[in-house]
Regions:
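Aspartic protease catalytic domain
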Residues: 2-42, 84, 95-97, 105-110, ...
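Eukaryotic endomembrane system proteins
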Residues: 185-196, 200-306
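Short glycine/serine/threonine-biased micro-segments
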Residues: 182, 223-226, 325-327, 421
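Short secondary-structure boundary/capping segments
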Residues: 118-122, 223, 340-343
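Disordered propeptide/prodomain
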Residues: 2-103, 111-185, 205, 239, ...
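Short beta-strand-centered segments at strand-helix junctions
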Residues: 113-115, 225-236, 335, 421-424
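Conserved catalytic motifs of the protein kinase core domain
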Residues: 100, 222, 321
Length: 449
């Protein structure tokens, strides 16, 4: 367990649901746990290797999807459904009567789905996972394959344009570059949601994928499905924010926390009990039209200490192939080549005398023996938003635990022209509020407890 707390965990993408539907202002809150708290412990280096592999594949898909979006082309891959590593879990209640499912929380995915059996298709049971038996739910309503919803609206969610009979359900084949996939049929279902005031409410007619098959062990390990939180017409976020107040928030505990420590996702107003450091609250513009369906922000620079780094403006410009998103499904932070080199060079100057190490199998570039290193010697790294807002992550969020006595700079070099991604380790121990209605992003330090 000691080793577990000192190694880099592969988290994700985010969070879960909720807020409220009553006369008094209330919201829904779900607990989230880090994926690795539920799994046997691999070696430290294998864990980081897994993180890097999955993060890199995720970043490739994000960049590819953003490029096609700018060209007005619909692509059937790269919804942000993250690839195994860097995951957080939550639980949702689906169907009537409601059944509980553990799902991967993913802010880059547009589709919510669960392992499912319908009309004899799908698994009877799965080891350590649950299967939704659709025919036992009185609220399950399949989407027909001849409907406009199937042929047009769900096309970017990988609906299949094959319709043998008018009664055939609308099918999907969700595939990802790492070989992961999910196949099934679309339906509308009832979700039972817990509220912050202790009550529950039911929301009817939410889109869900009834997955009769899925492949990709690392991606779906320990999960019953996926909760899609990217912002699109049919994502959970879109429907939940319409119902529960136009905003959602989440707080990711330190990535080395044990499984008995939960973080949360809330749809609706953030309870005052979670905003313990209101004076430190910062607000920036959330540009929802910039890189859809991802949550884009306008970063204009990075400083180390009092020094603003020399990073070309085109790194941050979407029209030049850059731009920046916040992504709870990537654990590390990706920076375009010019930004990456400036950041690691700037930080290295303050690590002179600290022994550098390149452990076998460890794919991060800059790692050090830091058992006797004082974090306070490392200057503050700060992200600068357009308009003057600043985000100053904790030092342990960019000099991250990799193995006992070893810490690494938590950055990955992306291609020269690539989307910058602020991963979940950089976001940890901050409360993040995404106000969809106002197009603002607010954040402040928090214990997330």
């Amino acid at each position: 367990m000691k080793t577990t707390t000192t190694m880099l965990l592969c988290l994700i993408t985010m969070l879960l649901i909720a807020s409220a539907h009553s006369k008094e202002e209330t919201a829904m809150r779900l607990d989230m746990k880090h994926r690795d708290s539920l799994s046997p412990n691999p070696s430290p280096y294998h864990r980081i290797e897994d993180i890097m592999g999955m993060d890199q594949k995720r970043h490739n898909v994000i960049s590819q999807k953003i490029k096609t979006t700018k060209g007005g082309v619909k692509m059937s891959l790269g919804s942000g459904f993250d690839f195994g590593a860097a995951q957080y879990f939550s639980e949702i209640m689906v169907g009537t009567p409601a059944k509980r499912f553990r799902v991967v929380v993913d802010t880059g995915s547009e589709l919510t789905w669960v392992n499912c059996r319908f009309h004899g298709q799908g698994p009877e049971k799965l080891e350590n996972r649950h299967v939704f038996r659709a025919e036992n739910s009185s609220s399950f309503r399949k989407v027909g394959c001849m409907t406009k919803t199937c042929s047009e609206d769900l096309a970017k969610l990988f609906s299949i344009a094959i319709c043998p009979t008018p009664r055939t359900p609308c099918a999907y084949d969700y595939r990802y570059v790492d070989g992961s996939s999910a196949q099934g049929v679309f339906a509308k279902e009832t979700f039972t949601l817990g509220l912050t005031n202790g009550s529950v409410t039911s929301v009817r007619g939410l889109l869900i994928g009834c997955s009769s098959a899925s492949e990709g062990g690392a991606s779906f390990r320990e999960a019953d499905g996926i909760l899609g939180l990217a912002l699109s017409d049919y994502s959970f976020t879109s429907k939940a924010t319409n119902i529960f107040g136009g905003k959602f928030s989440y707080c990711l505990v330190d990535h080395t926390s044990h499984k008995n420590v939960s973080n949360y996702l809330i749809f609706g107003s953030t309870p005052s009990s979670t905003t313990t450091e209101a004076p430190a609250r910062r607000t920036a513009r959330l540009d929802l039209s910039l890189l859809p369906p991802f949550y884009a922000v306008n970063i204009v620079g990075i400083s180390i200490g009092e020094e603003m780094l020399n990073i070309p403006p085109q790194v941050w410009g979407v029209k030049k192939g850059g731009g920046t998103i916040l992504d709870s499904g990537s654990s590390l932070t990706f920076l375009a080549e010019a930004a990456y080199k400036a950041v690691v060079t700037g930080l290295q100057r303050h690590l002179v005398g600290v022994k550098r190490i390149k452990p076998e199998g460890l794919p991060i570039e800059f790692c050090y023996y830091t058992s006797k290193f004082d974090d306070r010697k490392l200057p503050q790294l700060t992200f600068h938003f357009m308009g003057g807002t600043r985000f100053a992550p904790y030092r342990r969020s960019y000099l991250i635990n990799a193995a006992p006595g070893i810490r690494c700079l938590g950055f990955v070099e992306a291609k020269a022209e690539a989307t910058n991604v602020i991963g979940n380790i950089m976001q940890q121990n901050h409360l993040w509020e995404f106000d969809i209605a106002a197009s603002t992003l607010s954040f402040s330090p928090s214990t997330c407890l």
